[in-house]
């Protein structure tokens, strides 16, 4: 289905703010609502906990559209005791007059007809976010009940729905001051549709904080009213995406104090870019279209990369920071340690693929490239000290990349010469079918024997870690390729890393990290996850990385064996079987288990417990901050993180 948007003509303010006229005639109806309850995944992605939270985002995005249009500056989100949600804004209020085509109130149309809203047709909004613009009607269809209250032109209107159907028609219930305007939506997700019904404050906090960063001067309050969970957060950032970059760089050493900021309008597209280099060796670039994350990038990202690479190479040549005989800096060299936010506002964005996560609008590349090239060139000329610091870091990155390439090529040549090229310490499995195969990354020599003996040699491989795993958060690419433990993992997995990564070459569909259930084991697990997250993130995204869960206790009574994986489970088992005559042992390490115990608790797919490591693109910013906190140089943020999160840890061995 194609949706024709009216062509923009006018000044920049009108482009962003749209029309003050926001009545029933600005609401356009495009199709019905029948399919939503039958196939909810098509509209909100899934019926998991992610889909549950997506309902909140849909309503919030409608309020953000009002903020982008210049009519709203405060949004409040409340989680109530029964896990229902209220979203209140101080925008213009959804129109309540009769929509001519439907012959019913615009409020009813917005909540009962799919693809009905001011974002279609152009007069209500010039730019808007939201998933396919489905918004309010989909939330209504997937809710047990939904009540909406509109404050508009001195009057208060209400309307109620259940599972998408009207239960109480629109009614004016009183008056309010002319200043008290806006929309309040209160809904309870339908428990028969969603796998989970409990909202996570932390999940909502991350998304709402991001929204506030992207919408300068918008205030968002998140309130949890549930008993025992009462808390409140407020997000309000006058610095917008510049503050966002500073927030993401927290815990890292910035190479220069000011966040570089480029802003402008070109090709009817509004562009904002904020960036700052830090002393790390990884790049973190986040792209947004109309405040919606585009994790797969697209034309706006391409435009930025082109501008960045050309501008810095031109500057380095003109200022003799690069010799005539030296090669140009690559984009990767310049982006090493870069944190960047790219935000574009487009009236009619075009996306590629099914997921709508990659921008395809060709004009966005031209707009971003032009604005960044011009304004970044000016910034470098005005700030030669900053320009020199970035160029020097980029030149070091170029040299390290060349050294890493030599090390990588040497590894490949060795692999070709010795035939298979797998690490000598790897006890491989005989099956060549990756879907059946799994590899255990085992800490230390003591557990190696039982792991080798207890595994299924047909489908289970074992790779021991004997030396120290490198903390890649603090290491350049050449050091990573020089580390024997990491080299062993790269070779065993088969995928390569970084720009060479190829998921189709993965040799094992389960990569299982097996360490002691103590602080040292947790540290080694974190080092390995840091490496995989930074250089093979697709392994985590596709669900190939797992943490084994060896037991903490073994309990024997009346010739029966029980295993406890936490102190709570240990207490529960003792309570059930009675402590009299019970023989209890605590495993201090994997090496204390015999082959049968390790096989039963950790190796055998029928009896073991595994934790799959999950991540999504929505989590990326929060994950970057967490890994920086845990694996970075600064001690104080790490101590604060541990103190704040210790209560969530079940096996803390201090």
Residue ranges of each PLM-predicted region?
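GHKL-family ATPase ATP-binding module
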Residues: 2-23, 33, 55-57, 65-67, ...
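Mature N-terminal segment immediately following signal peptide/propeptide cleavage
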Residues: 25-38
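Conserved short strand/loop->alpha-helix "switch" segment adjacent to the catalytic nucleotide/phosphoryl-transfer site
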Residues: 38-57
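A short glycine-centered beta->alpha linker in the GHKL/HATPase_c
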Residues: 93-98
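Short adenine-binding "F-helix/F-box" segment of the Bergerat
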Residues: 99-100, 107
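C-terminal interaction appendages of subunits in large macromolecular complexes
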Residues: 399-418, 433-438, 449, 453-455, ...
């Amino acid at each position: 289905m194609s949706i024709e948007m009216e062509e923009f003509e006018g000044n920049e303010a009108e482009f962003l703010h749209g029309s003050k006229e926001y009545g029933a005639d600005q609401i356009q109806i495009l199709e019905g609502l029948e399919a939503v309850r039958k196939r909810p995944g098509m509209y909100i992605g899934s019926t998991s906990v992610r889909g549950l939270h997506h309902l909140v985002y849909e309503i919030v995005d409608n309020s953000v559209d009002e903020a982008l249009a210049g009519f709203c500056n405060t949004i409040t989100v409340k989680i109530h005791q029964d896990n229902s949600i209220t979203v209140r804004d101080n925008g213009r209020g959804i129109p309540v007059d009769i929509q001519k085509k439907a012959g019913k109130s615009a409020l009813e149309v917005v909540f009962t007809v799919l693809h009905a809203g001011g974002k279609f047709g152009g007069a209500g909004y010039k730019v808007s976010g939201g998933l396919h613009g489905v918004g309010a009607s989909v939330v209504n269809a997937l809710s047990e009940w939904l009540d909406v209250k509109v404050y508009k032109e001195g009057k208060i209107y209400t309307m109620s729905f259940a599972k998408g159907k009207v239960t109480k028609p629109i009614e004016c219930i009183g008056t309010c001051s002319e200043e008290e305007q806006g929309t309040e939506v209160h809904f309870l997700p339908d428990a028969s549709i969603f796998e989970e019904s409990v909202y996570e404050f932390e999940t909502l906090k991350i998304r709402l904080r991001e929204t506030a960063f992207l919408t300068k001067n918008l205030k968002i309050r998140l309130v949890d009213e549930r008993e025992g969970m009462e808390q409140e957060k407020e997000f309000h950032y006058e610095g917008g995406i510049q503050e966002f970059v500073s927030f993401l760089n927290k815990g890292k050493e910035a190479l220069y104090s000011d966040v570089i900021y480029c802003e402008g309008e070109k090709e009817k597209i509004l562009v904002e870019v904020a960036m700052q280099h830090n002393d790390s060796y990884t790049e973190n670039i986040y792209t947004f279209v109309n405040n919606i994350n585009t994790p797969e990038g697209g034309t706006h990202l391409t435009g930025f990369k082109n501008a960045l690479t050309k501008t810095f190479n031109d500057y380095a040549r003109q200022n003799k920071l690069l010799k005539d005989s030296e090669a140009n800096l690559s984009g990767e060299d310049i982006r090493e340690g870069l944190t960047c936010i790219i935000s574009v506002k487009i009236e009619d964005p075009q996306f590629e693929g099914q997921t709508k996560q990659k921008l395809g609008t060709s004009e966005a590349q031209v707009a971003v490239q032009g604005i960044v090239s011009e304004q970044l060139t000016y910034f470098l000329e005005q700030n030669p000290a900053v320009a020199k610091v970035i160029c020097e870091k980029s030149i070091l990155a170029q040299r390290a990349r060349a050294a890493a390439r030599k090390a990588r090529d040497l590894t490949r040549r060795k692999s070709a010469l010795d035939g298979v090229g797998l690490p000598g310490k790897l006890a491989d499995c005989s099956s060549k079918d990756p879907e059946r195969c799994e590899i255990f990354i085992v800490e230390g020599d003591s557990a190696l024997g039982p792991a080798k003996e207890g595994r299924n040699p047909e489908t289970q491989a074992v790779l021991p870690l004997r030396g120290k795993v490198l903390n890649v958060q603090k290491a350049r690419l050449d050091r990573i390729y020089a580390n024997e433990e990491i080299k062993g993992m790269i070779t065993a997995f088969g995928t390569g890393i970084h720009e060479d990564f190829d998921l189709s070459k993965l040799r094992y569909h389960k990569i299982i990290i097996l360490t002691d259930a103590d602080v040292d084991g947790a540290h080694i697990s974190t080092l390995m996850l840091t490496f995989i997250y930074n250089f093979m993130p697709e392994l985590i995204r596709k669900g190939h990385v797992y943490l084994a869960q060896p037991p903490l206790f073994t309990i024997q009574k009346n010739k029966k064996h029980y295993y406890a994986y936490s102190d709570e489970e240990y207490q529960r088992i003792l309570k059930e079987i009675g402590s009299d005559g019970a023989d209890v042992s605590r495993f201090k390490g994997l090496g204390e288990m015999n082959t049968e115990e390790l096989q039963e608790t950790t190796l055998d797919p029928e009896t073991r417990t595994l934790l799959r490591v999950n991540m999504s693109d929505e989590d990326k910013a929060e994950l970057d901050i967490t890994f920086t906190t845990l694996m970075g140089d600064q001690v104080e943020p790490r101590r604060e993180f541990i103190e704040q999160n210790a209560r969530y840890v079940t096996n803390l061995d201090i």
